[in-house]
């Protein structure tokens, strides 16, 4: 069993699968019905919710066993949630935001695969059946590749006409924070060989925390 995920409600048997399914459909239905009452985006919310449920079912039943595809499905799930949130808030999404969300989600998904593989190599406990289809070297290359794409995409985003016209033409000054954050994260997992769970790292690493806070402050000052 996964050293962390085994404590989740369903995995730890605190919530039965039947109860979880009932709660899922009740909450999903209540949310979509609520949007039907307050605005006309209810049908789109239903489509997003239905698509997300089907995607998760396909992932749970068989796609999570397929290397590479499993991580891409996780990233697609984030895009569906992003689209649903935009519909609910009546916000027009920028194609830059969609692209960066997908690539960042893909990066984090592969980072977790690397963490699972490292745990398997150290303890012999396999928490994900398809993890044997990966190697540390391969995942290091993938993470380096995706981190480069994230950096380039963010730079292009800050320089794009639609962003400079609506926000600030000086948004590019936030680029060093993004680069520093990426390089620090890669240093943690490749040099320090630490746990590469993004949540754990962000909660514990002061350098990364300062980088995120610095980016947020400068970004907010520039657009407001």
Predicted regions and their residues:
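Membrane-water interface at loop-to-transmembrane-helix junctions
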Residues: 91-92, 127-146, 205
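Cytosolic, membrane-interface loops and tails of multi-pass inner-membrane proteins
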Residues: 1-12, 110-137, 191-198
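Transmembrane helix-loop-helix
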Residues: 21-60, 64, 151-179, 183
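Cytoplasmic-side transmembrane-helix entry/capping segments in multi-pass membrane proteins
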Residues: 67-77, 202-208
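Multi-pass membrane catalytic core of lipid/isoprenoid biosynthesis enzymes
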Residues: 1-49, 95-106, 141-151, 206-224
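Interfacial loop-to-transmembrane junctions
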Residues: 186-213
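Alpha-helical transmembrane segments
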Residues: 91-110, 166-179
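C-terminal ends of transmembrane helices
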Residues: 54-67, 112-120, 184-194
């Amino acid at each position: 069993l996964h050293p962390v995920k085994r404590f989740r409600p369903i995995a730890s048997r605190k919530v039965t699968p039947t109860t979880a399914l009932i709660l899922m459909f009740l909450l999903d239905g209540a949310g979509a019905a609520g949007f039907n009452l307050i605005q006309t985006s209810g049908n789109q919310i239903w489509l997003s919710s239905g698509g997300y449920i089907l995607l998760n079912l396909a992932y749970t039943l068989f796609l999570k066993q397929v290397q590479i595809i499993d991580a891409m499905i996780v990233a697609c799930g984030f895009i569906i949630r992003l689209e649903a949130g935009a519909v609910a808030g009546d916000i027009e999404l920028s194609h830059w935001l969609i692209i960066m969300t997908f690539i960042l989600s893909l990066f984090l998904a592969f980072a977790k695969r690397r963490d699972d593989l490292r745990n398997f190599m150290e303890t012999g406990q396999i928490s994900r059946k398809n993890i044997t289809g990966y190697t540390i070297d391969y995942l290091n290359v993938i993470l380096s590749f995706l981190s480069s794409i994230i950096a380039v995409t963010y730079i292009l985003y800050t320089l794009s006409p639609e962003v400079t016209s609506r926000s600030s033409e000086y948004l590019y000054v936030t680029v060093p924070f993004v680069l520093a954050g990426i390089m620090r994260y890669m240093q943690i997992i490749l040099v320090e060989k630490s746990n590469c769970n993004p949540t754990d790292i962000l909660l514990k690493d002061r350098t990364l925390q300062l980088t995120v806070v610095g980016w947020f402050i400068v970004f907010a000052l520039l657009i407001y």
